Curated annotation (Swiss-Prot):
Keywords: Activator, Chromatin regulator, Developmental protein, DNA-binding, Nucleus, Repressor, Transcription, Transcription regulation. The BTB domain interacts with the BTB domain of Trl in vitro. Found in a Pc-containing complex. GO terms for cellular component: condensed nuclear chromosome; nucleus; PcG protein complex; polytene chromosome. This is Longitudinals lacking protein-like. The keyword Transcription regulation applies.
Length: 127
């Protein structure tokens, strides 16, 4: 007689790869996008869930302003940096020229992008 409370562990081996690929595809196709980011007179569509997961700044902003499809106007953000930040959020990597790197990192820090922004725990203390 088999015990009915026996548990089985099931694992999707390429789950993370699939999720990254799927979110990138959804963004590229503009499928299910639910937020528009605007800067320098241009716009980018994105997903609230991705922005919230990758940035406490966007998470707080979206929680404070719950609307079906908000348009977030970003002052003092270059469109090229916004595109690169979204690429980083959706793919986990991005190419940025050496010339653009300092300004890009400053923008990423201002928008609190995880993996790019300095957090108190990642700041090295000199002792």
């Amino acid at each position: 007689m088999m015990s009915s409370d026996q548990q089985f562990f099931l694992k999707w081996n390429d789950f993370q790869t699939n999720m990254v690929t799927s979110f990138r595809h959804l963004r590229d196709e503009k499928s299910f996008t639910d937020v528009t980011l605007a800067c320098e007179g241009q716009t980018c569509k994105a997903h609230k869930m991705v922005l919230s997961a990758c940035s406490p700044y966007f998470k707080a902003l979206l929680e404070e302003n719950p609307s079906k499809h908000p348009i977030i106007i970003l002052k003092d953000v270059s469109y090229i940096h916004l595109q690169a930040i979204l690429e980083f959020m959706y793919a986990g990597e991005v190419n940025v020229s050496q010339e653009q790197l300092p300004a890009f990192l400053k923008t990423a820090d201002r928008l609190k992008v995880k993996g790019l922004a300095e957090t108190p725990s990642s700041i090295k203390r000199e002792g």
